[in-house]
Swiss-Prot record:
The gene is pyrH. It catalyses: UMP + ATP = UDP + ADP. Catalyzes the reversible phosphorylation of UMP to UDP. GO terms for biological process: 'de novo' CTP biosynthetic process; UDP biosynthetic process. It is found in: Cytoplasm. InterPro entries: AceGlu_kinase-like_sf, Asp/Glu/Uridylate_kinase, Uridylate_kinase, Uridylate_kinase_bac. Belongs to the UMP kinase family. Homohexamer. UMP binds at G55, D76, A137, G138, A139, P140, Y141, L142, T143, T144. It is an enzyme of class 2 (transferase). This is Uridylate kinase. GO terms for cellular component: cytoplasm. Coiled coil: none annotated. Pathway: Pyrimidine metabolism; CTP biosynthesis via de novo pathway; UDP from UMP (UMPK route): step 1/1. It comes from Chlamydia trachomatis serovar A (strain ATCC VR-571B / DSM 19440 / HAR-13).
Amino acid sequence: MMKKRVKRVLFKISGEALSDGDSSNRISEERLSRLIAELKVVRNADVEVALVIGGGNILRGLSQSQSLQINRVSADQMGMLATLINGMALADALNTEDVPNLLTSTLSCPQLAELYNPQKASDALSQGKVVICTMGAGAPYLTTDTGAALRACELKVDILLKATMHVDGVYDQDPRECADAVRYDHISYRDFLSQGLGAIDPAAISLCMEAGIPIKMFSFARHSLEEAVFNTVGTVISSAEGGQL
């Protein structure tokens, strides 16, 4: 169990968490329903919940840039728009379940979402609203991991939880390629960076290191959001003396 009371968290949710893998079904009703149900459980445990949603189920900016010969800036902006589509789906599903929420966008889209403002978002969290952050960091060449780290720092969360669909933490090698890869229960920010581990954008690690915000990376395919918040799962990245949360 967690050693300290967690009051405010930020989930970084992969866009793939909303897809069932069917190329014609970018947002799965079953996957969306599961995510909404699990967000409700965490919120009902008196935890303030913010989340940054990816857009990989719809479009990945870098891969589109390479495969379609679209320039990188445009491709990344298209990827940011994909996160807004996912955020709108989440907000509407939360509304259907009578869960108060605030849909925000890093870039101005006044007819679709409220322009992200750290103080307004923090106030909304204090009021019990789920805050959905879309459009990543709001600039090309920056990943949604970095966007999530920025939001985590601005909102002063207790922990950033990165949910993935493929691996259950940070390994010394890519477990999808190396059968003998070893998973870390805990690794320090500096060791993560010095070893060049690729599970999380190093810019995101650096931001959280400066702010002293631990990161937990876990498998959303294996664990619920509640387990990620309250139990010892996945890998924690924190200060050298931080240990597993």
